[in-house]
Amino acid sequence: MAFTMQPVLTSSPPIGAEWRYEVKYDGYRCILRIHSSGVTLTSRNGVELSSTFPEITQFAKTAFQHLEKELPLTLDGEIVCLVNPCRADFEHLQVRGRLKRPDKIQESANARPCCFLAFDLLERSGEDVTLLSYLDRKKSLRELISAAKLPASPDPYAKETIQSIPCYDHFDQLWEMVIKYDGEGIVAKKTNSKWLEKKRSSDWLKYKNFKQAYVCITGFNPNNGFLTVSVLKNGIMTPIASVSHGMRDEEKSAIREIMEQHGHQTPSGEFTLEPSICAAVQYLTILQGTLREVSFIGFEFQMDWTECTYAQVIRHSKPVHPKLQFTSLDKIIFEKNKKTKEDFIQYMIEVSDYLLPFLKNRAVTVIRYPHGSRSESFFQKNKPDYAPDFVQSFYDGSHEHIVCEDMSTLLWLCNQLALEFHVPFQTIKSRRPAEIVIDLDPPSRDDFLMAVQAANELKRLLDSFGITSYPKLSGNKGIQLYIPLSPEAFTYEETRQFTQLIAEYCTNAFPELFTTERLIKNRHCKLYLDYLQHAEGKTIICPYSTRGNELGTVAAPLYWHEVQSSLTPALFTIDTVIDRIKKQGCPFFDFYRNPQDEPLSAILHQLKKKS
């Protein structure tokens, strides 16, 4: 059973009691079969993928080993690399799918595991259930997922690599969530539908979350009727898509006439055209700088072709409040590399999937630079009176704190030139830390290697305790080590005991390197270990936030193998960090699923016994 039932694309979602709705994910459609002798993972075209995604097949063997009476069982679903509850990273999945060497596959599986999202049940206890109704199959799947103690809905921070896609009764309820998380779309399924092998059936309808972009027409192929459309990227007109679908006959005729009169015909017969004519297109996602599933909307004769920028495409790629406006996009804000406000906003949009989880439920403090990084700056933690209603906030009884959990709030703050985002160690409804952060602060940028040495010494110590730590550049001159904790697991008093223990060990074992002296003049060019900074009311620069310096450097998470003498903070800027994530993933990808409660509790227990 390899060839799967397929949904039909619809331009309007079906509404009614006879329909249920599921999130549509951008991944590899697969059949997962689990039986007593092993596991198989097969693509919809019959390609065996078990060895390509060992984190799924290996987990499947253990997840269902105590449910032998349920075997053999067969699940229909999607292999994805989750970014958030409604969206997957198809670009990373494609890279992963092309790997052939077992060692490279395992390395990628460890660094950024993919997961199988089950949305249908085809076989249970060896019995074919495809002829049961959709609702009955879904109920049976929920029972199975519950018995196996697997996530009932997609969770990018869960350790389990088999999860479930739930169904919703109401389209509007789910569509709001899909828009919020920038998901691919929704699949509507008839409640009485059977699962039909090798069929594309109108019992399943897919409704996609298309975006709109403005492009410049720069080429035309008369042989197939496709337009080449381009945008300004780094000052160069760069092709971003080929499009034919959606064009009316009269529009095609007009383009052909324009090309023949004003274009240049190449030896191959294709035409090129100097930038002049703008158009609006619809697309689904951006993959490696190219628009996917593109269709033509119409000409935009009132636009100037210089408005068709890649940054404009990125700005329109995320769901934001209709009242959000951007101003002075050409203002230079990072002087040394001449980066504009538009460049900054583009970076924040592209990094938002990795930044926002660390801002979630935190009372954020921003540092604003109204005239760019060379100008005066000021801190802001309260929501100003002039902020629009859509800007999120939290009232603690005395102050209205800014809370930044969505794109609209994030981009409003960016438009106010909030270049730095600082967060406390606890969430808005807690007085207990959600992580420990050890701040390694060398005397100057020229002394950064001291931070590298200090970080590695601390890693050896933490490893000896059985504690996993995560390094991050401060974005200025230092390194910060993160230790994740479960919510409400420890008090600040307890974490202070631990950070003080670390500080005392370091200053005693390496007196020439570390100091806890708060007065700069008394530090004698040693690295300052600020264990007092980890306290209620204190803040730390958020992962992936920019810093307000002339380069626009980023507080970038690191892999431990990168923390060596060749590490150069100046190379981690808004120009490089996005490409880095696309190629290497996020070093903090499993941060929230890896709390270090057990080893920390053991250390605190020993400290208590000694006292």
UniProtKB/Swiss-Prot annotation:
Keyword ATP-binding assigned: yes
The keyword Transferase is assigned to this record: yes
InterPro entries tied to this protein: DNA_ligase_ATP-dep_cent (IPR012310), LigD_ligase_dom (IPR014146), LigD_Pol-like_3 (IPR033652), LigD_pol_dom (IPR014145), NHEJ_ligase_prk (IPR014143), NHEJ_LigD (IPR052171)
Biological-process GO terms, alphabetical: DNA recombination; DNA repair; sporulation resulting in formation of a cellular spore
Pfam families given in the database record: DNA_ligase_A_M, LigD_Prim-Pol
Catalytic site: K24 (n6-amp-lysine intermediate)
Annotated TM spans: none
GO molecular function terms attached to this record: ATP binding; DNA binding; DNA ligase (ATP) activity; DNA-directed DNA polymerase activity; exonuclease activity; metal ion binding
Enzyme nomenclature, EC number: 6.5.1.1
Residues the entry annotates as binding Mn(2+) 2: D439, D441
Keywords: ATP-binding, DNA damage, DNA recombination, DNA repair, DNA-binding, DNA-directed DNA polymerase, Exonuclease, Hydrolase, Ligase, Manganese, Metal-binding, Multifunctional enzyme, Nuclease, Nucleotide-binding, Nucleotidyltransferase, Sporulation, Transferase
Induction behaviour: Transcriptionally regulated by SpoVT and sigma-G factor.
Chain intervals for the UniProt region annotation (DNA repair polymerase domain (Pol)): 325-564
Enzyme class: ligase
Region: Ligase domain (Lig), residue numbers: 5-310
Cofactor annotation comment: Binds 3 Mn(2+); 2 Mn(2+) for polymerase/primase activity and 1 for ligase activity.
Gene null: resulting phenotype: Stationary-phase cells lacking this gene are more sensitive to ionizing radiation (IR) than cells lacking Ku (YkoV); a double mutant is not more sensitive than the ku knockout. Spores lacking this gene are more sensitive to UV, IR, ultrahigh vacuum, and dry heat.
Gene3D superfamilies tied to this protein: DNA ligase/mRNA capping enzyme (3.30.470.30), DNA primase, PRIM domain (3.90.920.10)
Amino acids binding ATP: E22, R29, R44, E78, F119, R200, K206
Cofactor: Mn(2+)
Subunit field text: Interacts with Ku.
Annotated function: With Ku forms a non-homologous end joining (NHEJ) DNA repair enzyme, which repairs dsDNA breaks with reduced fidelity. Probably involved in DNA repair during spore germination.
Extra information: LigD has variable architecture. In Bacillus lacks the 3'-phosphoesterase domain (PE) found in Mycobacteria and some Gammaproteobacteria.
Protein name: Bifunctional non-homologous end joining protein LigD
